[in-house]
Amino acid sequence: MKTQRQAKILELVRERTIETQEELAAALRAEGFEVTQATVSRDIKELSLIKIPGENNTSYYASPGEPMIRRGGEDRLRRLVRLSLSDINSSENLIIIKTPPGEAQGMASAIDHVHWPQIIGTVAGDDTILVIVKPKEATPEVVQRFLELARG
């Protein structure tokens, strides 16, 4: 039962934003597990779950090594795009993003870490990022995602 419960905990923190032990216990109960807060606390410790800062002074549980790729990475990219995207243009399967001087490499790194399936890579200079998209038909969708991030 413990192994199944802990597997479910890992699944829950991968798929949802769980901020408290109480939320995790409620989610487990909804999945049919009988748990107490003390049991959840022990499981969190045994699974080495960590708390990751979210937006608006919140934090959520995640497994070590996984969080920045998911929500934390998307939050970081959103902040960088909102603050630094000066211009965006595309042609075929290439997107050019302009940033203020010195900010392109940080944003390119954030783009790489969110692992959007349509983006196969980035190349960054001082103030310009080349984003390579596959298939080329996905380019307008990727541009739109960047514009949505820029709007907040």
UniProtKB/Swiss-Prot annotation:
Subcellular location: Cytoplasm
Residue pairs linked by disulfide bridges in the UniProt entry: none
Record's keyword terms, sorted: Amino-acid biosynthesis, Arginine biosynthesis, Cytoplasm, DNA-binding, Repressor, Transcription, Transcription regulation
Alphabetical list of InterPro entries matching this protein: Arg_repress, Arg_repress_C, Arg_repress_C_sf, Arg_repress_DNA-bd, WH-like_DNA-bd_sf, WH_DNA-bd_sf
UniProt pathway: Amino-acid biosynthesis; L-arginine biosynthesis [regulation]
Gene Ontology cellular component list: cytoplasm
NCBIfam families attached to this UniProt entry: argR_whole (TIGR01529)
Function: Regulates arginine biosynthesis genes.
Protein name as catalogued: Arginine repressor
Organism: Desulforamulus reducens (strain ATCC BAA-1160 / DSM 100696 / MI-1)
Gene name of the record: argR
